[in-house]
Amino acid sequence: MATTIPTTATATMCPSPPVPTISPLLRTTHQCQPSPSLSSPFSIKLSTALVCGDTTVDRVVDSSVMIKPEKWGIQSEKRRKRRRRRRVGYERLEPEEEENAGVEAEAETISVPVVGASRSGFLSRLEEVQLCLYLKEGAKLENLGTSVEENEMVSVLLASGRGKKKRSANEILCRRKEAREKITRCYRRLVVSIATGYQGKGLNLQDLIQEGSIGLLRGAERFDPDRGYKLSTYVYWWIKQAILRAIAHKSRLVKLPGSMWELTAKVAEASNVLTRKLRRQPSCEEIAEHLNLNVSAVRLAVERSRSPVSLDRVASQNGRMTLQEIVRGPDETRPEEMVKREHMKHEIEQLLGSLTARESRVLGLYFGLNGETPMSFEEIGKSLKLSRERVRQINGIALKKLRNVHNVNDLKIYYSSSE
């Protein structure tokens, strides 16, 4: 260790007994040997000389020309705090422990620090422009054919279509591949920082990062450096749009239209705002008033936002009954409804018994009481060989008789229960 001490002349080193070194970790002793002074432009300018030797070290220690330990402690504490702040990104992105070692290795490559867009890129303006130009040229060549692999005929056609030589076309395609890899690697932190804000919405973090990387490359192909913006500023919105579309299309078993997904997102956000404001769960009317929408639209959005439930889900505490055994299908009828229909059919038969056979027949055909399809007066007349007007008169007389029957009010019970 070399230490600088002020002196006016060249230091003279003399033999001395062995002394311990300044480092406590080194348990050896050194014999002080005469050594010439080491001069440098820095020492000459400041009238100092660089002297090495254990005796010089002792003199420096005795004269207290050392940096105080307190200062080193403060700087070390500051460095530790900065490392802890940077390590927060790793902790937030820590994936769930998997038993498969391959999954853990893949997750470790994704756990990168979450930083802002200003620190995510390591490319200069010139590099951004060059890489984006490679992407644009490669995209134009790729649009001329469906395959850009090692096919001589395809390479010739692509080159002739763009008015370029075969060699230059292959170079552009290779540069495009390299540019995609470099942009994806340099702006990965920006993609991760955006993707972490959309966790817990149906897709895991790895899928969100993958979709964000696709949006990053799409935005880079359409980047225009003449506008004066940085690439990170432009692709931010492409990354966000790609992630939102992926959540809308891939996060649910039953896909929702884009407009309905946007409406459900607005309703969910308004519900959270009103919950914090009112300190309770808001109603559909309050959400509709907050968003200036119809109550029916809000209720529809709430229904569509519910996650699907498996029919194999256990519905009882003992675990012996599932939802499939409880929920009825569209063609199934509950036992209570079957009993109600039988009672109502019996009441109607008693009412029709107070009429004549022709009147009962006309009412049955007109209203479809016996499970038949309702018919018009003209169709009933053709069936009974009567005129249309006569059938209408018979129907009116039969209804007038039924209104005067004492037990006609018993049917109102079934009518009110059906509502």
From Swiss-Prot:
Q: What Gene3D superfamilies does this protein's entry cite?
A: 1.20.120.1810, Winged helix-like DNA-binding domain superfamily/Winged helix DNA-binding domain
Provide the Gene Ontology terms for cellular component: chloroplast
Factors inducing expression = Slightly induced by blue light, especially after dark adaptation.
| UniProt cross-references to PROSITE patterns, sorted A to Z | SIGMA70_1
State the phenotype upon gene disruption. Answer: Reduced transcription of the plastid ndhF gene.
Please give the NCBIfam families that the UniProt record associates with this protein.
Answer: sigma70-ECF (TIGR02937)
Q: What does the similarity note say?
A: Belongs to the sigma-70 factor family.
Its job: Sigma factors are initiation factors that promote the attachment of plastid-encoded RNA polymerase (PEP) to specific initiation sites and are then released. Regulates transcription of the ndhF gene which codes for a subunit of the plastid NDH [NAD(P)H dehydrogenase] complex.
The protein, known as: RNA polymerase sigma factor sigD, chloroplastic
Native source organism of the sequence: Arabidopsis thaliana (Mouse-ear cress)
Q: Which gene encodes it?
A: SIGD
